[in-house]
A protein has these predicted regions:
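Sec-dependent N-terminal signal peptides
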Residues: 4-13
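Short regulatory "switch" loops immediately downstream of catalytic or recognition motifs
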Residues: 6, 121-128, 209-215
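Binuclear metal-dependent hydrolase catalytic cores
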Residues: 17-183, 194, 261-295
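Cap/insert and terminal regions of metallo-dependent hydrolase folds
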Residues: 172, 181, 189-281
Length: 296
């Protein structure tokens, strides 16, 4: 049974049903395995087009859970080459072929994406031979993007560099459809590019890291990780500058604290709408801006 729970939020707009922009959080987790929070991945739908932002662990399972057979997903955007954002790509690609996907899939990513895709496809040559020898199958077409806009049937996706500490070639994305905008920060610490792209956006999807003082003081490796992500004080600065209509904290690295603590701390210095993402949370940006859960 599919469940829908409208939560809140209405925006004034002249959009009609055919102009609806929808985003669904397939996975909102981190590298740590968690059945309630699978690997990071977001499905974006508008104008009969579907695309993915990142393909973390369990993406294909979540697509199956919402009844999506992958046939319309022809464009995937990878924010960076950390394994937790790309490990689900092989599963998506191979399983989509089982479902007889007719079209190839474009993979847009930073430097290194072509080498990654070549290696991935080579790894499964025996499987492909056994299953599809003499027949056509859907392939991956990997494209190394720079900061350019990519138009997918009126959905405009613009990658921009962020600041993920020691990680080179890390990106966020700005997604435009008609008069609606979504900004996805990617993995980043405080970044001017995120701020500049997110000013006045309808939805800012931003990562967060938060720890207790005790945990941080006693973990040298975590202190290094902490510097590569956006802490509570930094996200407050971002939000007070950007003033997005809605902020969704995503891919949350929480150590010794919980979501309620993070929201309390943010609300001390920022009065806008802030929530945490959940797996299978879906949002319609149209005449009404509705947030609901979808899934079996």
């Amino acid at each position: 049974m599919i469940k829908y729970f409208v939560i809140f939020f209405v925006l004034l707009s002249n959009a009609n049903g055919s102009d609806l922009l929808n985003i669904t959080f397939l996975g909102t987790g981190t590298p740590r395995p968690n059945l309630d929070k699978l690997g990071p991945s977001i499905l974006i739908k508008a104008n009969q087009e579907e695309l993915l932002i990142d393909v973390g662990r369990g993406t294909t399972l979540r697509l199956n859970q919402i009844g999506n057979n992958y046939s319309k997903i022809n464009n995937i955007y990878l924010s960076h080459m950390h394994y937790d954002h790309i490990i689900g790509l092989a599963d998506f690609w191979l399983t989509s072929n089982l479902w007889q996907k007719k079209t190839d899939t474009n993979i847009y990513g930073p430097k290194g994406v072509k080498k990654f895709c070549d290696g991935l496809m080579n790894s499964y040559q025996l499987d492909l031979k056994y299953r599809y020898e003499g027949n056509n199958y859907s392939k991956l077409k990997c494209i190394n993007f720079s900061e350019i806009s990519i138009n997918n049937n009126k959905i405009l996706v613009t990658p921009f560099t962020n600041d993920h500490g020691h990680v080179d070639n890390s990106y966020g994305f700005k997604i435009l459809f008609n008069d609606k905008s979504i900004v996805y920060s990617g993995d980043t610490t405080l970044s001017k590019n995120v701020v500049n792209n997110a000013k006045g956006t309808d939805i800012l999807i931003h990562e967060i890291i938060a720890t207790s003082k005790k945990v941080l003081d006693n973990n040298k490796k975590l202190r290094k990780v902490f510097k590569s992500h956006t802490n509570i004080n930094q996200i407050i600065k971002v939000l007070n500058t950007c003033k997005p209509k809605l902020t969704i904290l995503n891919h949350a690295l929480l150590f010794g604290v919980n979501e309620e603590y993070v929201l309390r701390e943010i609300k001390k210095s920022y009065s806008g709408n802030v929530i945490f993402s959940k797996d299978l949370m879906s949002i319609d940006l149209g005449e009404e801006h509705n947030i609901f859960n979808i899934g079996k």
